[in-house]
């Protein structure tokens, strides 16, 4: 529904008024007209006549208020507006504030009539009004475009729409051919008839969307975006406002707890000397390697061999197992131990035999043969899960290097 807005602009330079043909005519006033208009200031008969016209118009508007309230006819307000404009055109140039006060009061009354008319519009009772059913079906058509596109549904643009276009073209042709013979009343009747036909055809066209009532068929985001684009709602700032009622939390006085922990015995750090550093270093590297070799020689003998994992793994300490692997790598590097593969391809270690030849030439040949022998470098990595799996696989219950 389009709202009716009543407004008019009055200037001393120009005056716009409708003529019988519907066209607007502008009357420009020159300086000579302004001089001649000063003669109206002293015309009491004209002022009295215009004043009487304003009073009669106010009486008519008072009577028309009941009609507007009952029918919602906006034409009453428009007729009164035209009457006020004609009265105002008669007093242009007259300096009489009393007449201007009556004119302003009349404009206020006309605005109230227009407001009452818009408020009391009764839809569906008159074909000149907007039909509520057509509004709903038009909204459905707007929101069903995506549904029609996804389901390959075509709008039923029946012959009524085409007939309306043809009828409109024919009416225009007849109007151009018979303008000489037609009267203004006939033209007005033809326009009303064409408008009635167009309204009926549009109503029939929109009926095809009336049976769509499922919520999921409509694109509600589309109508929301349209409303957000063309609506005049003021932006709100509710999201910037905090809670309106903030209760002040009462302050709770707490008593600090005394520390009753007993003070332990005072301990000072041990002083580090050069002798203690040397002794610690001897225990952690070379001595541990020597102890590891002595235990292997004592338990296996010169000819025995043992699985590498059974030799290094300590089932009670993961860190100790890593240390044993570290010591074993030193023994292999220095040529004290020899690592081989058993029948299953698992690594085994044994004590490397010394050269037993008495002849110096034979010793040198054996030494060169051992140097030329193929050597493999292995990077062995052991983590906690692997360590547990090896203990379970070989059923290791006690460390070999205890």
From Swiss-Prot:
Keyword Mitochondrion listed: no
InterPro entries: Nse4/EID, Nse4_C, Nse4_Nse3-bd
Disulfide bond annotation, renumbered to this chain: none
Sequence segments annotated as region (Disordered): 1-45, 166-195
BP-aspect Gene Ontology terms: chromatin looping; DNA repair; double-strand break repair via homologous recombination; regulation of telomere maintenance
Keyword Transcription belongs to the record: no
Family recorded in the similarity comment: Belongs to the NSE4 family.
Function of the molecule: Acts in a DNA repair pathway for removal of UV-induced DNA damage that is distinct from classical nucleotide excision repair and in repair of ionizing radiation damage. Functions in homologous recombination repair of DNA double strand breaks and in recovery of stalled replication forks.
Protein name in UniProt: Non-structural maintenance of chromosome element 4
Annotated organism of origin: Saccharomyces cerevisiae (strain ATCC 204508 / S288c)
């Amino acid at each position: 529904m389009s709202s009716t807005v009543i407004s008019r602009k009055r200037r001393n330079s120009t005056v716009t008024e409708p003529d019988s043909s519907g066209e607007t005519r502008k009357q420009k006033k020159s300086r000579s007209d302004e001089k001649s208009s000063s003669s109206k200031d002293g015309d009491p008969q004209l002022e009295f006549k215009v004043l009487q016209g304003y009073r009669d118009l106010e009486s008519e508007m008072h009577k028309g208020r009941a009609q507007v309230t009952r029918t919602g006819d906006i034409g009453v307000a428009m007729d009164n507006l035209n009457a006020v404009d004609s009265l105002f055109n008669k007093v242009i140039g007259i300096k009489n504030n009393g007449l201007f006060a009556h004119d302003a009061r009349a404009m206020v009354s006309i605005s109230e009539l227009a407001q009452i008319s818009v408020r009391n519009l009764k839809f569906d009772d008159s074909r000149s009004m907007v039909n509520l059913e057509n509004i709903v079906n038009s909204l459905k058509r707007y929101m069903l475009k995506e549904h029609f596109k996804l389901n390959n549904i075509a709008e039923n643009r029946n012959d009524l729409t085409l007939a309306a276009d043809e009828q409109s073209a024919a009416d225009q042709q007849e109007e151009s051919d018979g303008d000489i013979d037609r009267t203004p009343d006939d033209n007005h009747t033809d326009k009303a008839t064409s408008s009635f036909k167009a309204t009926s055809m549009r109503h029939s066209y929109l009926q095809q969307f009336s049976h769509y009532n499922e919520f999921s068929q409509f694109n509600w985001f589309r109508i929301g975006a349209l409303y957000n684009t063309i609506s005049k709602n003021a932006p709100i700032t509710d999201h910037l406002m905090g809670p309106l009622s903030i209760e002040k939390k009462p302050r709770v006085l707490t008593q600090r707890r005394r520390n009753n922990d007993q003070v332990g015995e005072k301990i000072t750090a041990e002083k580090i000397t050069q002798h203690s550093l040397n002794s610690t270093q001897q225990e952690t590297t070379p001595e541990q390697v020597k102890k590891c070799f002595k235990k292997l020689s004592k338990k296996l003998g010169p000819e025995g061999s043992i699985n590498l994992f059974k030799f290094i793994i300590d089932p009670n300490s993961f860190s100790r197992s890593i240390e044993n692997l570290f010591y074993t790598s030193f023994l292999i590097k220095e040529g004290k131990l020899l690592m081989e593969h058993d029948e299953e391809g698992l690594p085994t270690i044994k004590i490397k035999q010394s050269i037993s030849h008495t002849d110096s030439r034979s010793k040198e040949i054996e030494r060169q043969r051992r140097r030329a022998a193929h050597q493999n470098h292995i990077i062995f990595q052991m983590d906690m899960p692997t360590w547990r799996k090896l203990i379970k696989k070989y059923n290791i219950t006690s460390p070999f290097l205890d």
